[in-house]
Amino acid sequence: MTRPDPIRSALFQISRPIFVTMRSGGPLFSHALPAHVSTQGEPSGPIPFDAFAPAVPLSLLGDRTFTARHHLKYPYVAGAMANGISSTQMVQTMAENGMIGFFGAGGLSLPEIEHAVVTLTSRLNDAPFGFNLIHSPADPDLETGTVQLYLKYGIRRISAAAFMRMTPALVYYRVKGIHQENDGRVTAPNQVIAKVSR
């Protein structure tokens, strides 16, 4: 019988197809079509494998609208963990590899956030990345100051966390710069992605 490790290994190689054939000793896994199966025309008899899963490249997982909207290669988001745990290096690595990372600005002072903003904007230019905006009900000035900082440096994506309702700062970020294109479409350049925690 096939041990679990080869099964797991075969299943985790999602960029390759997998063929499963049942044998008396258990299932056999292969990433190649059995050699005696023709790839031309219709099969003349029963297909000599019991199950098949096609290759699924990482770039095809998830919502294609999301990847197009944010100019991503892969539909993956990482970060927005508070106190800079989601570091500038992590955000940069995600952006340089076709994914999106959010810097974890929650719990940091405005000068610390500004340092991270300057670092990432100088390194990444138009690459996809963003910053966290955490709701601060006990300190609305911090929330407003963070938004003003993001707008000052042209941060176009934020991950909004811990919001129980819309706040003036969050709404201001979203609508700042809203305009109508020549073709009549309304464009809001600042994007808000809601971070939902349980």
PLM features: residue spans?
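Active-site entrance/lid segments in N-terminal catalytic domains of soluble metabolic enzymes
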Residues: 1-198
